[in-house]
Amino acid sequence: MNTKNIFKTFFLCLSVFSLSFTLNAQELKPLRLGVAGVSHGHLHEVLIRLERGDFEIIGVAEPDEQLRVNNPLRKKVDSSLFYADLEEMLDKTKPEAVVAYGSIYDHLAIVEACAPRGIHVMVEKPLAVNMNHANRMARLARENNTLLLTNYETTWYDTNHEAYRLIKNEN
């Protein structure tokens, strides 16, 4: 899957709101998605979109044993795909992209683990705990030619997509 298709699929399957267009899952292979952390509330968005078929969860890394054992993904993802260690999950499952659903303090470590492996990352807002972390994450993404996305809710509003289309067509 080329970077353009990964980028398109990444944005589509990780949105927290429905987009104004759909992805023809028959044209693209499902995105191989890793999950880093299970404590963020947006994890439920992945759960309700699993059946669409445009992505598959191929690994879940959660260091906290209680969270690893007791989380909603356990009902939909095979228990053999859960790992205590992020790097082990990345090396064994080889995801194309990872969603960070843990602490903001973990965002830098997730990008440090993923970017050198060529794995794209989506983090929840805010991007980082400080500018040093944000700059390091941006540098890692640039140096490794990977996408780093911060999930801002308004990005997925249909009205914003329509406004962009109207402005683009006027110019």
What label would you give each PLM region?
Residues 1-11:
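Bacterial N-terminal signal peptides that target proteins for export
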Residues 9-20:
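Bacterial N-terminal signal peptides
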Residues 21-77:
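N-terminal Rossmann-like dinucleotide-binding module
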Residues 31, 55, 80, 119, ...:
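Short, well-ordered coil/turn segments that N-cap beta-strands
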Residues 35, 123, 148-150:
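Hydrophobic residues in well-ordered beta-strands that form the structural core
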Residues 77-140:
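Beta-loop-alpha module in the N-terminal Rossmann-like domain of NAD(P)-dependent dehydrogenases
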Residues 128-171:
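A contiguous active-site-proximal alpha/beta segment in oxidoreductase catalytic domains
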